Amino acid sequence: MDFNFSQDELDLRDGAREYLRDRCTPEVLRKLVEKNSADLGSWSEMIEMGLVGFLVPESAGGLGMCNTGFVLLAEEAGYVASPEPLIDVAGVAAPILALLGIDSAAEIAGGTSRVVTAHSLNPYVNQLQPTDKVLQFKDDAVSLSDASDIEVDAAESIDPLRRLSKIVSAKSIPIASGDEARHLAAKAASKGALFTAAELLGLAAAMIDMSKNYVVERKQFGVAIGTFQAVKHHLSTAFTKLEFARPVVYRAAATLSDDDEHAALHVAHAKIAAGDAAINAAEAAIQVHGGIGYTFEADLHLFMKRVWALTGLWGDRNYHINKVDRAVFDRRSKLGPATTFQSAGNAEGH
Protein backbone atom coordinates (compact mmCIF):
# COMPACT_ATOMS: atom_id res chain seq x y z
CA MET A 1 0.00 0.00 0.00
CA ASP A 2 1.39 3.39 -1.03
CA PHE A 3 0.88 6.11 1.58
CA ASN A 4 2.62 8.80 -0.47
CA PHE A 5 0.61 11.57 -2.10
CA SER A 6 1.03 12.03 -5.84
CA GLN A 7 2.44 15.29 -7.18
CA ASP A 8 -0.97 16.05 -8.74
CA GLU A 9 -2.63 15.68 -5.34
CA LEU A 10 -0.07 17.94 -3.69
CA ASP A 11 -0.37 20.56 -6.44
CA LEU A 12 -4.17 20.59 -6.13
CA ARG A 13 -3.82 20.84 -2.34
CA ASP A 14 -1.50 23.82 -2.70
CA GLY A 15 -3.85 25.54 -5.14
CA ALA A 16 -6.84 24.95 -2.86
CA ARG A 17 -4.87 26.22 0.14
CA GLU A 18 -3.91 29.46 -1.58
CA TYR A 19 -7.44 30.06 -2.85
CA LEU A 20 -9.28 29.21 0.37
CA ARG A 21 -7.00 31.18 2.67
CA ASP A 22 -7.40 34.23 0.45
CA ARG A 23 -11.15 33.82 -0.11
CA CYS A 24 -12.37 32.56 3.27
CA THR A 25 -10.82 34.70 5.99
CA PRO A 26 -12.16 35.14 9.55
CA GLU A 27 -13.22 38.66 8.54
CA VAL A 28 -15.33 37.25 5.70
CA LEU A 29 -16.86 34.65 8.02
CA ARG A 30 -17.73 37.34 10.57
CA LYS A 31 -19.53 39.37 7.91
CA LEU A 32 -21.55 36.30 6.90
CA VAL A 33 -22.60 35.77 10.52
CA GLU A 34 -23.56 39.45 10.83
CA LYS A 35 -25.67 39.19 7.66
CA ASN A 36 -27.24 35.94 8.93
CA SER A 37 -25.90 34.20 5.84
CA ALA A 38 -23.73 31.18 5.14
CA ASP A 39 -23.22 31.71 1.41
CA LEU A 40 -19.53 32.31 0.79
CA GLY A 41 -20.22 32.76 -2.93
CA SER A 42 -17.26 30.62 -3.92
CA TRP A 43 -19.00 27.51 -5.24
CA SER A 44 -18.66 28.37 -8.94
CA GLU A 45 -14.96 29.12 -8.46
CA MET A 46 -14.46 25.79 -6.68
CA ILE A 47 -16.11 24.07 -9.65
CA GLU A 48 -13.73 25.83 -12.06
CA MET A 49 -10.75 24.70 -9.96
CA GLY A 50 -11.92 21.08 -10.21
CA LEU A 51 -12.47 20.72 -6.47
CA VAL A 52 -16.14 19.77 -6.78
CA GLY A 53 -15.46 17.16 -9.46
CA PHE A 54 -12.35 15.83 -7.72
CA LEU A 55 -13.74 12.31 -7.18
CA VAL A 56 -15.81 12.17 -10.37
CA PRO A 57 -14.25 9.96 -13.11
CA GLU A 58 -12.57 11.74 -16.01
CA SER A 59 -15.06 10.09 -18.36
CA ALA A 60 -17.80 12.05 -16.60
CA GLY A 61 -15.95 15.35 -16.68
CA GLY A 62 -14.22 15.13 -13.30
CA LEU A 63 -10.59 14.87 -12.26
CA GLY A 64 -10.75 11.13 -11.52
CA MET A 65 -8.74 11.47 -8.30
CA CYS A 66 -9.11 9.32 -5.16
CA ASN A 67 -9.87 9.58 -1.45
CA THR A 68 -6.26 10.23 -0.44
CA GLY A 69 -6.21 13.46 -2.41
CA PHE A 70 -9.65 14.59 -1.29
CA VAL A 71 -8.56 14.23 2.34
CA LEU A 72 -6.05 17.02 1.67
CA LEU A 73 -8.80 19.25 0.25
CA ALA A 74 -11.07 18.59 3.23
CA GLU A 75 -8.20 19.45 5.57
CA GLU A 76 -7.69 22.79 3.82
CA ALA A 77 -11.43 23.52 3.92
CA GLY A 78 -11.34 22.85 7.65
CA TYR A 79 -8.36 25.14 8.19
CA VAL A 80 -10.42 28.13 7.04
CA ALA A 81 -13.75 26.85 8.44
CA SER A 82 -15.29 27.05 4.97
CA PRO A 83 -19.10 26.95 5.12
CA GLU A 84 -19.42 25.41 1.65
CA PRO A 85 -20.87 21.83 1.63
CA LEU A 86 -17.81 20.42 -0.13
CA ILE A 87 -17.82 17.09 1.71
CA ASP A 88 -21.53 16.38 1.27
CA VAL A 89 -21.55 17.26 -2.43
CA ALA A 90 -18.07 16.45 -3.76
CA GLY A 91 -16.94 13.91 -1.16
CA VAL A 92 -20.08 11.80 -0.79
CA ALA A 93 -22.83 12.48 -3.34
CA ALA A 94 -20.68 12.80 -6.47
CA PRO A 95 -18.69 9.52 -6.14
CA ILE A 96 -21.80 7.55 -5.09
CA LEU A 97 -23.73 8.80 -8.12
CA ALA A 98 -20.72 8.03 -10.31
CA LEU A 99 -20.71 4.44 -9.01
CA LEU A 100 -24.32 4.15 -10.13
CA GLY A 101 -23.53 5.64 -13.53
CA ILE A 102 -26.04 8.43 -13.03
CA ASP A 103 -25.71 11.64 -15.06
CA SER A 104 -25.94 13.77 -11.92
CA ALA A 105 -22.27 13.01 -11.18
CA ALA A 106 -21.22 14.67 -14.43
CA GLU A 107 -23.63 17.51 -13.74
CA ILE A 108 -22.00 18.08 -10.34
CA ALA A 109 -18.53 18.18 -11.90
CA GLY A 110 -19.74 20.54 -14.62
CA GLY A 111 -21.55 22.81 -12.22
CA THR A 112 -25.01 22.40 -13.75
CA SER A 113 -26.30 20.58 -10.66
CA ARG A 114 -25.56 20.44 -6.95
CA VAL A 115 -26.50 17.35 -4.93
CA VAL A 116 -26.42 17.43 -1.14
CA THR A 117 -26.69 14.40 1.13
CA ALA A 118 -29.05 13.06 3.80
CA HIS A 119 -28.07 9.90 5.70
CA SER A 120 -29.00 8.33 9.04
CA LEU A 121 -25.55 9.38 10.31
CA ASN A 122 -25.93 12.81 8.72
CA PRO A 123 -29.69 13.40 8.90
CA TYR A 124 -29.74 17.17 8.47
CA VAL A 125 -29.13 18.60 5.02
CA ASN A 126 -26.59 21.41 5.08
CA GLN A 127 -26.91 24.52 2.88
CA LEU A 128 -29.94 23.29 0.90
CA GLN A 129 -30.67 25.65 -2.00
CA PRO A 130 -33.93 25.77 -4.03
CA THR A 131 -32.17 24.45 -7.15
CA ASP A 132 -30.36 21.60 -5.37
CA LYS A 133 -31.04 17.89 -5.46
CA VAL A 134 -30.87 15.64 -2.41
CA LEU A 135 -29.30 12.17 -2.37
CA GLN A 136 -31.11 10.40 0.45
CA PHE A 137 -30.05 7.15 2.13
CA LYS A 138 -33.03 5.81 4.06
CA ASP A 139 -33.73 2.29 5.29
CA ASP A 140 -32.95 -0.06 2.39
CA ALA A 141 -33.22 2.50 -0.38
CA VAL A 142 -31.24 5.28 -2.01
CA SER A 143 -33.23 7.99 -3.74
CA LEU A 144 -32.72 11.29 -5.53
CA SER A 145 -35.08 14.24 -5.12
CA ASP A 146 -35.35 17.81 -6.36
CA ALA A 147 -35.36 20.36 -3.57
CA SER A 148 -38.69 21.62 -4.90
CA ASP A 149 -40.22 18.18 -4.18
CA ILE A 150 -39.05 18.10 -0.57
CA GLU A 151 -40.77 19.45 2.53
CA VAL A 152 -38.26 20.51 5.17
CA ASP A 153 -38.16 22.08 8.60
CA ALA A 154 -35.34 24.40 9.55
CA ALA A 155 -33.05 23.01 12.26
CA GLU A 156 -30.74 24.92 14.56
CA SER A 157 -26.99 24.39 14.72
CA ILE A 158 -24.48 25.50 17.31
CA ASP A 159 -22.45 26.67 14.31
CA PRO A 160 -23.98 29.86 12.81
CA LEU A 161 -22.42 29.04 9.43
CA ARG A 162 -24.20 25.67 9.10
CA ARG A 163 -27.75 26.09 7.76
CA LEU A 164 -29.54 22.83 8.44
CA SER A 165 -32.80 21.41 7.12
CA LYS A 166 -34.63 18.31 8.33
CA ILE A 167 -36.49 16.40 5.63
CA VAL A 168 -40.14 15.88 6.58
CA SER A 169 -41.36 14.32 3.34
CA ALA A 170 -40.08 13.94 -0.20
CA LYS A 171 -41.19 12.91 -3.66
CA SER A 172 -38.18 10.92 -4.70
CA ILE A 173 -36.88 8.72 -7.49
CA PRO A 174 -35.44 5.41 -6.19
CA ILE A 175 -32.01 4.71 -7.68
CA ALA A 176 -30.97 1.70 -5.58
CA SER A 177 -32.59 -0.74 -3.18
CA GLY A 178 -31.90 -3.81 -1.06
CA ASP A 179 -28.32 -5.04 -0.72
CA GLU A 180 -27.03 -2.51 -3.24
CA ALA A 181 -28.57 0.36 -1.26
CA ARG A 182 -27.10 -0.92 2.00
CA HIS A 183 -23.68 -1.23 0.36
CA LEU A 184 -23.89 2.33 -0.98
CA ALA A 185 -25.07 3.66 2.38
CA ALA A 186 -22.06 2.05 4.06
CA LYS A 187 -19.73 3.56 1.44
CA ALA A 188 -21.30 6.97 1.92
CA ALA A 189 -20.92 6.69 5.70
CA SER A 190 -17.24 5.79 5.39
CA LYS A 191 -16.54 8.65 3.00
CA GLY A 192 -18.48 11.13 5.11
CA ALA A 193 -16.72 10.10 8.33
CA LEU A 194 -13.28 10.08 6.70
CA PHE A 195 -13.56 13.51 5.11
CA THR A 196 -15.13 14.99 8.24
CA ALA A 197 -12.13 13.64 10.18
CA ALA A 198 -9.85 15.43 7.72
CA GLU A 199 -11.83 18.64 8.14
CA LEU A 200 -11.39 18.32 11.91
CA LEU A 201 -7.62 18.05 11.39
CA GLY A 202 -7.69 21.35 9.52
CA LEU A 203 -9.76 23.03 12.22
CA ALA A 204 -7.38 21.78 14.92
CA ALA A 205 -4.35 23.07 12.99
CA ALA A 206 -6.00 26.47 12.54
CA MET A 207 -6.80 26.85 16.25
CA ILE A 208 -3.26 25.85 17.22
CA ASP A 209 -1.81 28.39 14.77
CA MET A 210 -4.17 31.12 16.01
CA SER A 211 -3.16 30.36 19.59
CA LYS A 212 0.53 30.29 18.72
CA ASN A 213 0.27 33.75 17.15
CA TYR A 214 -1.71 35.08 20.12
CA VAL A 215 0.70 33.88 22.82
CA VAL A 216 3.63 35.46 20.96
CA GLU A 217 1.88 38.85 20.83
CA ARG A 218 0.16 38.84 24.24
CA LYS A 219 2.45 40.06 26.99
CA GLN A 220 2.27 39.72 30.74
CA PHE A 221 4.88 40.85 33.26
CA GLY A 222 6.75 42.36 30.34
CA VAL A 223 7.19 39.10 28.40
CA ALA A 224 5.17 37.12 25.85
CA ILE A 225 2.91 34.59 27.59
CA GLY A 226 4.18 32.00 25.11
CA THR A 227 7.39 31.86 27.13
CA PHE A 228 5.52 30.47 30.14
CA GLN A 229 5.94 26.72 30.58
CA ALA A 230 2.24 26.09 31.28
CA VAL A 231 1.25 27.75 28.01
CA LYS A 232 3.90 25.80 26.10
CA HIS A 233 2.60 22.54 27.54
CA HIS A 234 -1.01 23.24 26.49
CA LEU A 235 -0.04 23.95 22.90
CA SER A 236 2.61 21.24 22.59
CA THR A 237 0.10 18.64 23.82
CA ALA A 238 -2.49 19.86 21.31
CA PHE A 239 0.08 19.81 18.51
CA THR A 240 1.23 16.30 19.43
CA LYS A 241 -2.34 14.97 19.39
CA LEU A 242 -2.86 16.55 15.99
CA GLU A 243 0.31 15.07 14.53
CA PHE A 244 -0.56 11.61 15.86
CA ALA A 245 -4.08 11.85 14.41
CA ARG A 246 -3.02 12.95 10.93
CA PRO A 247 -1.38 9.66 9.81
CA VAL A 248 -4.38 7.75 11.15
CA VAL A 249 -6.62 9.75 8.82
CA TYR A 250 -4.23 9.34 5.89
CA ARG A 251 -4.04 5.58 6.49
CA ALA A 252 -7.85 5.38 6.47
CA ALA A 253 -7.96 7.27 3.17
CA ALA A 254 -5.45 4.87 1.61
CA THR A 255 -7.27 1.73 2.75
CA LEU A 256 -10.66 3.11 1.70
CA SER A 257 -9.26 3.87 -1.76
CA ASP A 258 -7.94 0.31 -1.99
CA ASP A 259 -11.23 -1.24 -0.75
CA ASP A 260 -9.29 -2.88 2.07
CA GLU A 261 -11.36 -5.25 4.22
CA HIS A 262 -10.47 -3.19 7.32
CA ALA A 263 -11.21 0.19 5.71
CA ALA A 264 -14.37 0.88 7.76
CA LEU A 265 -12.44 0.10 10.96
CA HIS A 266 -9.63 2.44 9.93
CA VAL A 267 -12.17 5.18 9.19
CA ALA A 268 -13.71 4.73 12.65
CA HIS A 269 -10.24 5.05 14.20
CA ALA A 270 -9.62 8.19 12.10
CA LYS A 271 -12.86 9.85 13.19
CA ILE A 272 -12.07 9.15 16.87
CA ALA A 273 -8.47 10.38 16.63
CA ALA A 274 -9.27 13.51 14.63
CA GLY A 275 -12.24 14.38 16.84
CA ASP A 276 -10.16 14.01 20.00
CA ALA A 277 -7.37 16.12 18.51
CA ALA A 278 -9.78 18.88 17.48
CA ILE A 279 -11.55 18.98 20.85
CA ASN A 280 -8.21 19.10 22.64
CA ALA A 281 -7.01 21.89 20.36
CA ALA A 282 -10.18 23.88 21.06
CA GLU A 283 -9.80 23.47 24.82
CA ALA A 284 -6.11 24.42 24.72
CA ALA A 285 -6.84 27.43 22.52
CA ILE A 286 -9.49 28.73 24.91
CA GLN A 287 -7.15 28.17 27.84
CA VAL A 288 -4.20 30.09 26.40
CA HIS A 289 -6.39 32.90 25.05
CA GLY A 290 -7.69 33.52 28.56
CA GLY A 291 -10.89 35.53 29.03
CA ILE A 292 -11.02 36.81 25.45
CA GLY A 293 -11.19 33.21 24.25
CA TYR A 294 -14.75 33.04 25.60
CA THR A 295 -15.92 36.11 23.68
CA PHE A 296 -17.08 36.86 20.15
CA GLU A 297 -14.14 39.27 19.79
CA ALA A 298 -11.84 36.30 19.22
CA ASP A 299 -12.12 34.49 15.87
CA LEU A 300 -11.62 31.29 17.81
CA HIS A 301 -15.34 30.75 18.42
CA LEU A 302 -16.03 30.29 14.69
CA PHE A 303 -13.66 27.32 14.57
CA MET A 304 -14.55 25.91 17.97
CA LYS A 305 -18.27 25.78 17.13
CA ARG A 306 -17.53 24.03 13.86
CA VAL A 307 -15.58 21.39 15.78
CA TRP A 308 -18.50 20.85 18.15
CA ALA A 309 -20.85 20.47 15.19
CA LEU A 310 -18.64 18.05 13.25
CA THR A 311 -17.64 15.69 16.06
CA GLY A 312 -21.16 14.23 16.07
CA LEU A 313 -21.50 14.15 12.29
CA TRP A 314 -21.27 10.85 10.39
CA GLY A 315 -21.17 8.98 13.70
CA ASP A 316 -20.22 10.40 17.09
CA ARG A 317 -17.32 9.22 19.24
CA ASN A 318 -19.33 6.45 20.95
CA TYR A 319 -20.59 5.14 17.61
CA HIS A 320 -17.07 4.73 16.26
CA ILE A 321 -15.63 3.41 19.53
CA ASN A 322 -18.30 0.70 19.51
CA LYS A 323 -17.31 -0.17 15.94
CA VAL A 324 -13.65 -0.51 16.97
CA ASP A 325 -14.64 -2.52 20.07
CA ARG A 326 -16.61 -5.01 18.00
CA ALA A 327 -13.67 -5.49 15.65
CA VAL A 328 -11.16 -5.95 18.46
CA PHE A 329 -13.25 -8.56 20.25
CA ASP A 330 -14.28 -10.37 17.07
CA ARG A 331 -12.05 -13.45 16.94
CA ARG A 332 -12.32 -13.49 13.17
CA SER A 333 -10.55 -10.12 12.92
CA LYS A 334 -6.92 -10.32 11.86
CA LEU A 335 -5.59 -8.15 14.65
CA GLY A 336 -2.80 -8.42 17.21
CA PRO A 337 0.88 -9.39 17.33
CA ALA A 338 0.31 -12.91 15.98
CA THR A 339 -0.99 -11.49 12.71
CA THR A 340 1.65 -8.77 12.58
CA PHE A 341 4.60 -11.09 13.10
CA GLN A 342 3.15 -13.78 10.86
CA SER A 343 2.89 -11.20 8.07
CA ALA A 344 6.47 -10.09 8.72
CA GLY A 345 7.66 -13.70 8.61
CA ASN A 346 5.87 -14.33 5.35
CA ALA A 347 7.42 -11.19 3.88
CA GLU A 348 10.88 -12.52 4.74
CA GLY A 349 10.11 -15.88 3.15
CA HIS A 350 9.85 -17.83 6.45
Regions found by a protein language model. Give the residues of each.
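Alpha-helical interface subdomain recognition
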Residues: M1-V80, G178, K187-H350
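FAD-binding core of flavoproteins
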Residues: A81-G91, P95-D209, N213, A338-H350
